[in-house]
């Protein structure tokens, strides 16, 4: 679809697609966006080496802003990761070492850059300014502008205390650090818009207020709704664990299947948020019923996987799904994995079969699965997944871990 422009009401487009939960000044922000390029930031603490589907709404929102000509900033919390955001958590996050934080930053940047074009100035680490600020200086510049009474009214803090869970002074100060980040990005990069999930509302408005109290630029904040699936699961989680956005943690095939298996009631909402289809097409697909709705789920799975892993990976996952699930298997209804005899004669290994069909993310992942005893043929562990297969695999049961079972079928 055509990209929105500065002059169009971008806020209205984002609202129509379901991205907007709260805004500090909707009309002011709409005018600000229409006036010309705006620098907006989205922040992540480096608590893992990837992002998951729960972060995807923010990535897509930033993508829409960039398509409209605005400037994205990715803020990595190299400093705040050492503290941990207490928002709506019952316990402290584990403290990570510097080497792990840097490895996590590298992984997050790789994921982010698939959704948003990053240039040399697009990536910022808050350690750049927080590592150098003194405690007394911070209290003087920032602490004087915050009331403890008001901070205690914010849901993220109040709920933690109401449940009588410990909240360290370190964590209590997190919201001040995030407010300081916003002001520093405004000063250093001309950033005037912060994006975040609904649980970040208090942190965002504290930054807006801090800039005002210090006589700085007018800042804006926009939060997105916290998503849950219709069956009540937190977005980004599946029965098997987190739905990661990098292939090293989750194979593209499994990522594709997450979207293909979504609840019927989520299809239209997810198409609006996680694809770039025009809204007329989103509404048409979302209105389908019965078996036709499954085709809409395939469209969703293809679109989401193409953005996360590339068009080739999306096609491979879709092709694998058609081959695996189109026909019923002859053994207890197991899904099929088809192997051509020609390919078998060329020396096909289980490692190649699983990677080529997007059933595993990499050769290394297959070898690790085999080394742990999780790769089995007819219940027997596969010692060497790199060994060439023979015609004897026809009809045999292939198990990947305890829950995923397939049947191999030779085709002429």
Swiss-Prot record:
Span of domain S4 RNA-binding: 348-411
Reaction(s) catalysed by this chain's protein: tRNA(Tyr) + L-tyrosine + ATP = L-tyrosyl-tRNA(Tyr) + AMP + diphosphate + H(+)
UniProt-listed Pfam families: tRNA-synt_1b
Subcellular location(s) per record: Cytoplasm
Annotated residues for binding of ATP: 237
EC number: 6.1.1.1
Keywords: Aminoacyl-tRNA synthetase, ATP-binding, Cytoplasm, Ligase, Nucleotide-binding, Protein biosynthesis, RNA-binding
Entry's family note: Belongs to the class-I aminoacyl-tRNA synthetase family. TyrS type 1 subfamily.
Name of protein: Tyrosine--tRNA ligase
């Amino acid at each position: 679809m055509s990209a929105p422009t500065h002059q169009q009401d971008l806020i209205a487009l984002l609202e129509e697609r379901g991205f907007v939960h709260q805004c500090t000044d909707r009309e002011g922000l709409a005018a600000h966006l229409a006036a010309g390029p705006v620098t907006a930031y989205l922040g992540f603490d480096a608590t893992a080496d990837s992002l998951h589907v729960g972060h995807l709404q923010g990535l897509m929102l930033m993508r829409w802003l960039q398509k409209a000509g605005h400037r994205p900033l990715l803020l990595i919390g190299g400093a705040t990761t050492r503290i941990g955001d207490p928002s709506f958590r019952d316990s402290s996050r584990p403290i990570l070492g510097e080497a792990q934080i840097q490895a996590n930053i590298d992984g997050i940047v790789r994921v982010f850059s698939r959704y948003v074009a990053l240039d040399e100035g697009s990536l910022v680490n808050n350690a750049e300014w927080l590592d150098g600020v003194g405690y007394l200086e911070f209290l003087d510049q920032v602490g004087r502008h915050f009331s403890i009474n008001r901070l205690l009214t914010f849901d993220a803090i109040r709920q933690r205390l109401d449940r009588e869970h410990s909240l360290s002074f370190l964590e209590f100060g997190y919201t001040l650090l995030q407010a300081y980040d916003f002001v520093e990005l405004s000063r250093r990069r001309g950033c005037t818009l912060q994006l975040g999930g609904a649980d970040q509302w208090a942190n965002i408005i504290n930054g807006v207020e801090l800039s005002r109290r210090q006589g700085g630029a007018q800042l804006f904040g926009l939060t997105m709704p916290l998503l849950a699936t219709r069956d009540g699961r937190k977005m980004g989680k599946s029965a098997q664990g987190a739905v990661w956005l990098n292939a090293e943690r989750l194979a593209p095939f499994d990522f594709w299947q997450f979207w293909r298996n979504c609840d019927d009631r989520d299809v239209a909402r997810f198409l609006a948020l996680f694809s770039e289809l025009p809204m007329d097409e989103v509404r048409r697909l979302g209105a389908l019923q019965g078996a036709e709705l499954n085709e809409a789920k395939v469209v969703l799975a293809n679109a989401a996987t193409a953005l996360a892993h590339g068009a080739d990976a999306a096609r491979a996952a879709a092709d694998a799904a058609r081959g695996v699930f189109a026909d019923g298997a002859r053994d207890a209804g197991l899904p099929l994995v088809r192997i051509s005899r020609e390919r078998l004669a060329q020396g096909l290994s289980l490692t190649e079969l699983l990677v080529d069909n997007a059933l595993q993310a990499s050769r290394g992942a297959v070898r690790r699965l085999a080394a742990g005893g999780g790769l089995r043929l007819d219940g027997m562990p596969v010692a060497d997944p790199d060994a060439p297969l023979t015609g004897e695999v026809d009809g045999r049961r292939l198990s990947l871990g305890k829950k995923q079972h397939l049947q191999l079928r030779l085709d002429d």
